[in-house]
Amino acid sequence: LKQKRKRHRLFGKMIGLCAGFSLLFATILIPGQALAEKQLAAPLRFDFGPGDVADGYTQVTAKDAYTPERGYGFTDLSKVNEENRGGSDAIRSDFVRVQGSSFVVNLPPADYTLSLIAGDTAGNTNITVKAESIVKVEPTAKTAGQFVEAGFELALIDGQLELYFSGDEAKINALVITPNKARTAGEHPSVYLAGDSTVQTYKSSMKPQAGWGQMIAPFFTNETIFVNRSIGGRSTKTFLVQGRLDDILRNIRPGDYLFIQFGHNDAAINNQERYVSPADYKVYLKTYIQGATQRGAIPVLITPVGRRDYDAASASFRISFPEYVQAMKETASETGVALINLSQLSVAYYDTLGLEGTLPLFLHLEPGVFPAFPDGVKDDTHFQEYGAEQIARLVAQGVRDLNIPLSSSVKTENLQ
């Protein structure tokens, strides 16, 4: 039940643009444009509390439940109350106290800057703020008369901003939502990599461990810029809730690429923080795809690279995480997004080398040879530099075969 509630919070929100926006936006949307092209023409300003309303702000009280018609409001009024301390400052003299509930606003998918004021002239404040499940305001405490003034950016994907407020005394005074200026294409495309430890770039102190993302640039022309945001231990879920996808989407430009390879940690059923079922894996992948395409970027799905998992009976290597490989292939088919089947490519490559021949690819190291691994290691998941380079070659080969604009940037002579 707990997992179902969590999934409802993450997935129950609107996916894509709704059939129409509420009356809240009727005067600020650019008339005559297709709905998908509409953007906020001016900031939205909310003044929380029952007292006087600041000029240019929309009042939000503890009685304002979210409705589609209103387009904003609280999701659970039982966890919301309000106070008015009085005074001449319309913003800071009153507030709405929120204890474990969300304030949601229907917005066009885009990038925004949010500015929040939280505090109380006569009492303490203790507040944490999550935006789209990402912690944007860490736990912060203020005494009477002090106010939290926080600003942060957010890449909105699903058409409804959700701000979740927690803390013993989360007192909201004001919120301003400002649309960011749309980015334009760069002179040359950048390729953003979103993935796990098999993709990430490692510090030199970790030699000889490497991910294929740090070895891929030589297979492409010099104009191609790779931005590797991959990091170990992440699944499609944790990469998102930790704000790593958000960081990519707030920087990616039209014409850029987003390469997506997850699966190793999504399948970790004994680690519920990371674990994502194959069905939910597809939901998360579609969120990545939607976020990229909304910003004019081109997503490319990459099935999880194979582990060194040998089947002696068939004298061949097994497909790693087959349910996730299939789920990603289905996602590519359902969305029309390009797919590189690195799972298949890597396992086929391992088969040409055999059990012993694959040892130099993976982190199988003797004790005392490398400072990062003084006791040695036998790791059939992660790569040495040579192995990472060979996997990068397979990815580049996959890009070449996709027949997308980036394909022309592959140095074919380096694939031999």
Predicted regions and their residues:
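N-terminal secretory signal peptides that target proteins for export/translocation
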Residues: 1-11
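Sec-dependent N-terminal signal peptides
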Residues: 9-24
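Sec-dependent signal peptide cleavage junction
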Residues: 25-39
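Serine-esterase "nucleophile elbow" of acetyl-processing enzymes
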Residues: 48, 163, 180-230, 245-258
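Alpha-helical cap/lid subdomain in secreted, periplasmic
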Residues: 244-389, 393-412
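Acidic/histidine-rich helix-loop elements
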Residues: 200-208, 230-242, 268-277
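Compositionally biased, intrinsically disordered or flexible polar/acidic segments
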Residues: 37-202
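Active-site-proximal beta-strand/loop segments in catalytic clefts of secreted hydrolases
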Residues: 49-51, 166, 194-198, 202, ...
